[in-house]
Amino acid sequence: MGAHHTATEQSARLFADACAVIPGGVNSPVRAFNAVGGTPRFITSANGYWLTDADDNRYVDLVCSWGPMILGHAHPAVVEAVQRVAADGLSFGAPTPSETELASEIISRVAPVERLRMVNSGTEATMSAIRLARGFTGRPKIVKFSGCYHGHSDALLADAGSGVATLGLPSSPGVTGAATADTIVLPYNDVDAVEEIFEQVGDQIAAVITEASPGNMGAVPPEPGFNAALRRITEEHGALLILDEVMTGFRVSRSGWYGLDPVDGDLFTFGKVMSGGLPAAAFGGRAEVMERLAPLGPVYQAGTLSGNPVAMAAGLATLRTADDAVYAALDKNADRLAGLLTDALTDAGVTHRVQRGGNMLSVFFTAEPVGDFATARASETWRFPPFFHALLDAGVYPPPSAFEAWFVSAALDDEAFDRIAAALPGAARAAAEASRPA
């Protein structure tokens, strides 16, 4: 247990091959390991909590495909559902019963959601929700928060977290001033800033969008009452509240963050868990708002593969398998991981905070509470790469960025935690011995 896994020859070869045909060798930037250095691991299979790479190294997975795999990988119920549906056809470009089934399942869990539209990614979900909010209110401006990531559509990439934070970019080349001219970015968890901007231009604001509990600047949960304050302010000014639950939805509880902090958004966005790891997402909300979408209303949104039957089957199987025992296991496993992290880093004398957003968590190398993007960026992020690589070499796979949340699955067992516990002291020492860049 805790043996080092340093062979990366096959992953290095595959990465070189990928770089010849794919920009940067990856299809999402964080996978390239730019934030931590080294060779990105090319995964060839996964089962339960185990990942296996091209060099036959095995890792305890603490990324879970960036959240969706709450049951663990290749869960039999999900695999069987996908195989059964795939045998009847992969895509039809026509309505299917499973779209209605999954929409009904989601609506039954999140009370403010009365209607739901399927899309193919979280980016599509938030982009479409913004368009709908503008179409419904007739107003142009959107308020978002620094460090909250809502996908890579132009209007929402301003001062985002996730990969943009990893790359150290304020936005992205190719995002024009015109695209973000109506995007107002405020500090997260700052109710006064929200009040002030609504006093100034409230009659122009279509919506406030926020991650229900952010995980893209690390796990930085809302201060108690923050989301409720957003609800109050938007209602007072006739704006909509969009709660982005792409990450938290059906992970932190069977009703997502709404189950922990029941604030009635006008619109919600979902992804990740809702499709069991296949590419699908959704946005939904009040019927009055959603029925402005085509074909009922004038706000256009469409997608050739939206509501794909295989993705719908994976989502239904995941949600229906995730019973109370699964959510209890997720919370218990997050508690256990947080305790091991705290003990190891404390024993090594490393100043740190382990922060939680439900069963999502992050390690910040700072003594200060992290309540916004500024404090997240002010932490000693240079300690993270050696911490990460020590864990990776010991067969534990954490997120390859200091600005991403860690995710547990219900599949984790004593063997998994024994490996994590064996790996952490060395990783904590590596963090303690890290040198601040010149």
From Swiss-Prot:
Pathway(s) where this gene product acts: Porphyrin-containing compound metabolism; protoporphyrin-IX biosynthesis; 5-aminolevulinate from L-glutamyl-tRNA(Glu): step 2/2
Modified residues (N6-(pyridoxal phosphate)lysine): 272
SUPFAM superfamilies: PLP-dependent transferases
Cellular compartments per GO CC: cytoplasm
CDD domains recorded: OAT_like (cd00610)
Reaction(s) this enzyme catalyzes, per UniProt: (S)-4-amino-5-oxopentanoate = 5-aminolevulinate
Record EC number: 5.4.3.8
Location(s) in or outside the cell: Cytoplasm
Cited InterPro entries: 4pyrrol_synth_GluAld_NH2Trfase (IPR004639), Aminotrans_3 (IPR005814), Aminotrans_3_PPA_site (IPR049704), PyrdxlP-dep_Trfase (IPR015424), PyrdxlP-dep_Trfase_major (IPR015421), PyrdxlP-dep_Trfase_small (IPR015422)
Keywords, in A-Z order: Cytoplasm, Isomerase, Porphyrin biosynthesis, Pyridoxal phosphate
Pfam families to which the protein is assigned, alphabetical: Aminotran_3
Domain of life: Bacteria
Gene Ontology molecular function terms on file: glutamate-1-semialdehyde 2,1-aminomutase activity; pyridoxal phosphate binding; transaminase activity
Cofactor(s), by name: pyridoxal 5'-phosphate
BP terms from Gene Ontology: protoporphyrinogen IX biosynthetic process
PANTHER family membership: GLUTAMATE-1-SEMIALDEHYDE 2,1-AMINOMUTASE, GLUTAMATE-1-SEMIALDEHYDE 2,1-AMINOMUTASE 1, CHLOROPLASTIC-RELATED
Oligomeric form and interacting partners: Homodimer.
Family from the record: Belongs to the class-III pyridoxal-phosphate-dependent aminotransferase family. HemL subfamily.
Protein name: Glutamate-1-semialdehyde 2,1-aminomutase
Organism of origin: Mycobacterium sp. (strain KMS)
